[in-house]
């Protein structure tokens, strides 16, 4: 995620070239939520492409394509050197996780209680962060194509992806690390407010008692 953020902010070739390798290794180590995060970032990348010039978009997508092909080539090479059939790899890393995911999605009911109330401590910070940035669209000219708005989309979609992953896996809760992260982002947004001391104190108390 950080590599992607740096790529959007600085638009350096090295970040776009490294991104497929980073996500490739992430996918190999843990298919989900890596796949969910990848989908979220692709949405932001496509949204960002609407505001880039043609030359910039060609450069970004060319680097991503070349890097992805190199990673796939190296992966196939490693599999062949170790005598691992490609079909076995596809079955183990792609088809099998998909079958598990489909069965869990089909048998699990996502409703208001599961999605919001179960993780209400995260939403206490996520909802204000969402509203602050949506209001900025109306208050700040062209904010919807500003880097800060792209950053908001990355954070928001990533949080939603992690919550969705947590609901499906039903493993030990690990996403509560998002609380101090979201608290810090709200803190940054409120540093120029008149009653910032009160707001910061409230954020600190909520963060302290929720974690």
Regions found by a protein language model. Name each.
Residues 35-36, 167-198:
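Hydrophobic/aromatic-rich transmembrane helices and adjacent perimembrane loops
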Residues 120-147, 158, 183-187:
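Hydrophobic, aromatic-rich transmembrane alpha-helices
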Residues 36-69, 140, 184, 188-192:
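Perimembrane helix-loop-helix junctions
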Residues 31-47, 128, 175-179:
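Transmembrane-embedded, aromatic-rich helix segments that form part
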Residues 66, 192-211:
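Signature aromatic-anchored transmembrane alpha helix within multi-pass, membrane-resident enzymes
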Residues 61-104, 162:
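Membrane-lumen/periplasm interface segments of specific transmembrane helices
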Residues 3-25, 54-66, 145-157, 197-200:
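Short hydrophobic alpha-helices at membrane interfaces in multi-pass membrane enzymes
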Residues 15-33, 37-42, 70, 156-166:
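Membrane-interface alpha helices of multi-pass inner-membrane proteins
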């Amino acid at each position: 995620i950080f590599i992607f953020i740096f790529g959007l902010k600085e638009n350096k070739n090295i970040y776009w070239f490294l991104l497929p390798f980073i996500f490739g290794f992430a996918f190999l180590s843990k298919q989900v939520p890596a796949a969910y995060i990848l989908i979220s970032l692709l949405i932001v990348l496509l949204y960002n492409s609407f505001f880039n010039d043609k030359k910039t978009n060609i450069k970004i997508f060319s680097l991503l394509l070349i890097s992805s092909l190199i990673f796939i080539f190296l992966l196939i090479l490693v599999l062949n050197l170790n005598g691992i059939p490609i079909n076995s790899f596809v079955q183990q890393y792609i088809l099998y996780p998909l079958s598990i995911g489909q069965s869990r999605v089909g048998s699990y009911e996502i409703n208001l209680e599961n999605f919001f109330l179960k993780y209400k401590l995260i939403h206490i910070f996520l909802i204000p962060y969402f509203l602050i940035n949506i209001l900025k669209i109306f208050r700040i000219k062209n904010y919807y194509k500003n880097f800060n708005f792209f950053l908001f989309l990355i954070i928001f979609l990533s949080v939603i992806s992690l919550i969705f992953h947590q609901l499906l896996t039903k493993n030990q809760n690990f996403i509560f690390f998002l609380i101090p992260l979201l608290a810090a982002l709200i803190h940054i947004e409120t540093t120029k407010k008149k009653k910032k001391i009160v707001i910061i104190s409230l954020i600190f108390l909520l963060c302290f008692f929720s974690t």
